[in-house]
C-alpha cells in the first residue's frame, strides 16, 4: 500500500506545480480564487497521503494545522498544569484531533499526542 500512496503523492505534487503555472496565467480574480481552492485541496490531499504513509493515523481527525508561535508548550493534558512533553516551534505541522474549551488536542507526525492552547495553532483550509 505504501508504494501506491507514494506514487499518488508524487502525482499530486506534479499536479500542484501545473496548477501553480496556471495560476500565473489567469486573467481574473475569480479564476485565481478557483485555482487557489484547487491548490488548497491538493495540499490537503498531499498531507493526507503523507499521514497514511506514516502509519500514525489518529483515531480522530479535525484538520491539519500549523503552529503559529515560536515556542509553544506541548502538554500531556488540556491544562496549564499539564506536564510539558515538548516545545513546538513556529511552522510545525500538526494534526488537530479534538477540542476541549480553550485547548486543542494534537498529534504530531511522529505519532506523539498532546495539547496546546488554541490560539497557538491555525487549522489549514
Sequence positions of predicted segments:
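Alpha-helical scaffold segments that form or flank carboxylate-/histidine-based iron centers
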Residues: 1-5, 29-44
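Alpha-helical bundle segments that constitute or directly flank the non-heme di-iron/ferroxidase center
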Residues: 1-26
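Alpha-helical transition-metal enzyme core signature, strongest for iron centers
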Residues: 11-19, 35-49
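Alpha-helical coiled-coil oligomerization motifs
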Residues: 24, 31, 50-57, 61
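SH3-family beta-barrel domains
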Residues: 54-76, 86-90, 97-100, 118-125
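Short, solvent-exposed loop/turn positions at domain surfaces
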Residues: 79-82
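SH3/SH3-like beta-barrel fold
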Residues: 91, 104-108, 116
Amino acid at each position: 500500500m505504501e508504494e501506491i500512496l507514494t506514487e499518488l503523492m508524487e502525482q499530486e505534487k506534479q499536479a500542484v506545480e501545473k496548477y501553480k503555472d496556471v495560476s500565473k496565467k489567469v486573467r481574473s480574480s475569480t479564476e485565481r480564487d478557483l485555482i487557489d481552492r484547487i491548490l488548497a485541496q491538493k495540499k490537503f490531499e498531499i498531507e493526507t497521503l503523507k499521514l497514511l504513509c506514516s502509519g500514525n493515523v489518529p483515531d480522530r481527525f479535525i484538520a491539519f494545522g500549523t503552529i503559529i508561535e515560536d515556542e509553544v508548550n506541548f502538554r500531556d493534558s488540556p491544562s496549564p498544569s499539564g506536564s510539558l512533553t515538548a516545545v513546538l516551534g513556529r511552522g510545525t505541522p500538526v494534526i488537530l484531533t479534538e477540542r476541549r474549551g480553550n485547548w486543542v488536542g494534537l498529534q504530531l507526525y511522529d505519532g506523539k499526542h498532546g495539547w496546546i492552547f488554541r490560539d497557538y495553532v491555525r487549522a489549514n483550509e
